[in-house]
Design a protein with these regions (language model features):
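Accessory terminal regions of nucleic-acid processing enzymes
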Residues: 1-310
Length: 310
């Protein structure tokens, strides 16, 4: 591998722009369909767009702030010294593959990925498990670096520090490289998007791409007739299953009667009263129109409906 660019004093916008030039570790799980928060559809649109999306949130901020601490705890637990990479690296054999490493292990052909984990996600790390999209990220780093192994140190807030060692598997890396390069040549280069996978974030992206409708335009969807039939079939199945689910809930309520709680092997059930106050918007608009208008705002969205014409 080679250093593509130093990240010391590199503005974040420039750093994000460099990452558009190839496939990074965080792209790997999404391309493989393993990332619950990001899809190949989103990776594609990020790569072809000139827009730099500087997305940040509290979880990402905490992850950055605690990276030093996680690396320190890793060194304490293993006795291995680590150092910052301070660069975007590029595979010389497969130049499409880029990587930002959290840490490199001093004196070894190895690296370290630092993670911070919510206690609500602790089960995903139980019994030696690693979330699949993180494992894909590490395999990507092994593919870029050519190193022998990679460590993952995960701080589960308030619980424990988990450390895993991932050893290079040449067949796994070969398969990963093939899929990443295929994604690039099949989708990014010809600018043909991959199919969305049904996740909420794909819906948000599609709505963002096409915010405004043209009332004078009607699309011919004949080529999607089979998909529309499949959707109708699924909708009918879901409706039937929802009714069956509701019938079971009704039986449980009849058994509980006025009990607030119920138990069964492997289950805890609650049926408790609650009160909430809601604004009567119709009355407010009628009796206090000035106040209603003062605290109202226009929200624009496109309503999507499919009606089956029998």
């Amino acid at each position: 591998m080679k250093r593509l660019v130093s990240t010391l004093n590199l503005p974040k916008e420039d750093w994000l722009r460099y990452r558009k030039c190839g496939i990074t570790g965080t792209d790997a799980g999404a391309i493989l369909g393993l990332n619950p928060y990001r899809s190949a559809f989103q990776v594609y649109h990020d790569k072809i767009s000139d827009t730099i999306e500087n997305i940040d949130n509290e979880a990402m901020r905490q992850g950055r702030d605690l990276e030093d601490y996680v690396a320190q705890r890793f060194s304490e637990a293993t006795g291995l010294k680590v150092r910052r990479a301070n660069a975007i690296y590029q595979s010389e054999e497969h130049p499409l593959l880029l990587a930002d490493f959290d840490r490199l292990i001093v004196g070894q052909k190895a690296g370290l990925e630092c993670k911070t984990v919510s206690p609500f996600s602790a089960d995903k790390w139980a019994d030696g498990k690693i979330p699949a999209h993180y494992l894909a990220q590490v395999d990507h780093y092994l593919a870029v670096s050519g190193f022998d192994c990679w460590y993952v140190a995960a701080l589960i807030f308030g619980r424990e520090m988990v450390i895993h060692k991932i050893v290079t598997d040449k067949q796994v890396l070969s398969d990963l490289i093939d899929k990443e390069e295929l994604f690039w040549t099949r989708h990014v280069v010809p600018q043909i998007p991959p199919a969305p996978n049904g996740c909420d974030s794909d819906t948000q992206k599609i709505n963002q791409l096409y915010e405004v409708d043209d009332r004078d335009k009607t699309a011919d969807l004949s080529a999607l007739h089979g998909l529309l039939d499949k959707r109708q079939e699924l909708s009918d199945q879901i409706e039937q299953m929802e009714q069956e689910k509701t019938a079971i809930e009704q039986q449980v309520k009849l058994q509980m009667q006025d009990a607030a709680y119920g138990t069964a092997p492997g289950y805890k059930v609650s049926w408790v009263s609650s009160e909430s106050k809601r604004v009567d918007s119709q009355r407010l608009r009628k009796e206090q129109p000035d106040i209603f208008n003062q605290y109202s705002k226009n929200v624009s969205s496109r309503r999507f409906t499919i009606v089956h014409a029998a």
